[in-house]
C-alpha cells in the first residue's frame, strides 16, 4: 500500500468529473487500499479518487470511531434522498476549514463493492452526509461550493497563501474531515 497525495482547493484537477470504472480488478483494489491508507493517515472519514488525482468513480468511507468499518463505493449512484439536515463539514482537500452544509438526511445508494459485486445501502446521519459529500467530488464539486462566493473566495485566498508558505493545516477533527 502507498499513501497518495491529496489535492487541495483550489487545484483545478479537483473540478474534473470522474469516469465510471469498467471493471473492478487488482488495479482498482490497489487504488482502494491506497485510498484507505491515505484517508486514515490524514485523518479523515471519506475520500474520493478525484481527491488523489484519479478520475475514476471510487470512494472510500469509514465513519466508525475505531477505523474498523471501511466501506467502498465504486460507480455509486444515489437512488433516493429523503429529508434535510444541516451538518458541519470539512474536507481533506480544504484542510482546516469547517462549515455548515445542508444535505439530504437519508439516502439510498447503489454501487459496486471492492470485488465488483453490486449492493444497495440505505442510511442516514453522518454516513449519508459523507456519501453525498464524496459523490460531489466525483462530479467536480466541493463543499465550499455550497458557501457564499465571498466566503469561498476568502477560504481560497487563505489556502493559496498557506500553500505558498508550505504551512497547510492538517485536519485534526476526524469526525468532520470528510
From Swiss-Prot:
Sorted UniProt keywords: Hydrolase, Iron, Metal-binding, Protein biosynthesis
Swiss-Prot/TrEMBL catalytic activity: N-terminal N-formyl-L-methionyl-[peptide] + H2O = N-terminal L-methionyl-[peptide] + formate
Origin: domain of life: Bacteria
Cofactor info, note text: Binds 1 Fe(2+) ion.
Keyword Transit peptide on entry: no
Family the entry assigns: Belongs to the polypeptide deformylase family.
Designated name of the protein: Peptide deformylase
Chain's gene name: def
Amino acid at each position: 500500500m502507498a499513501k497518495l497525495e491529496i489535492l487541495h482547493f483550489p487545484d483545478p484537477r479537483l473540478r474534473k468529473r470522474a469516469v465510471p470504472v469498467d471493471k473492478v480488478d487488482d488495479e482498482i483494489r490497489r487504488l482502494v487500499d491506497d485510498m484507505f491508507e491515505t484517508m486514515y493517515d490524514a485523518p479523515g472519514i471519506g475520500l474520493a479518487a478525484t481527491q488523489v488525482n484519479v478520475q475514476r468513480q471510487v470512494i472510500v468511507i469509514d465513519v466508525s470511531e475505531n477505523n474498523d468499518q471501511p466501506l467502498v463505493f465504486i460507480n455509486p449512484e444515489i437512488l433516493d434522498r429523503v429529508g434535510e439536515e444541516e451538518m458541519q463539514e470539512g474536507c481533506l482537500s480544504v484542510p482546516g476549514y469547517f462549515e455548515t452544509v445542508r444535505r439530504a438526511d437519508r439516502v439510498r445508494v447503489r454501487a459496486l463493492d471492492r470485488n465488483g459485486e453490486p449492493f444497495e445501502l440505505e442510511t442516514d446521519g453522518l454516513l449519508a452526509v459523507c456519501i453525498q459529500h464524496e459523490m460531489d467530488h466525483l462530479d467536480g464539486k466541493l463543499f465550499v461550493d455550497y458557501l457564499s462566493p465571498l466566503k469561498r473566495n476568502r477560504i481560497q485566498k487563505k489556502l493559496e497563501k498557506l500553500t505558498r508558505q508550505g504551512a497547510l493545516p492538517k485536519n485534526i477533527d476526524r469526525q468532520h474531515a470528510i
